[in-house]
């Protein structure tokens, strides 16, 4: 499983939090985090920046990788839904890559290729915090599927 995320200069607290959840994961459920440089915020339009980031993400995709795009307009999901989806994908041998877009969002062509578009809620979260929330939710989903006591509803 991988997370492709736009942006490379994150505050130290983001890296520390993501690393903390990553080290808790067992090897067979390791998550690879791939940072993709954000498009330069010049006079270009948001659409052209998203297109450039989309092309960079496309170049980083692996064969047979299925995309799950995190998007404000995506389906609002529960942790249990995430856990069930991940268990199903693992059982079916689906290689999954989560995508966190840049400040302008995710290009429509990338959204169209996704097997799922999920929202972490209807609140607006800064991109660094989305990384931390996703890292924690991936760990929590694993804990549900593994019967680990971390998750208490």
What does each model-identified segment do?
Residues 1-25:
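N-terminal beta1-alpha1 ligand-phosphate binding loop
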Residues 3, 68, 101, 134:
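Conserved RecA-like P-loop NTPase ATPase core
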Residues 4-6, 34, 99:
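Short hydrophobic segments within beta-strands
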Residues 9, 72-75, 102-105:
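Short glycine-rich anion-binding loops that position phosphate/pyrophosphate groups of nucleotides
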Residues 15, 19-22, 51-54, 108:
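Short, surface-exposed alpha-helical segments at coil->helix boundaries
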Residues 29-97:
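S-adenosyl-L-methionine/SAH cofactor-binding core of RNA-modifying enzymes
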Residues 84-124:
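A mid-sequence interfacial segment
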Residues 108-152:
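Structured adenosyl-cofactor binding patch, chiefly the S-adenosyl-L-methionine
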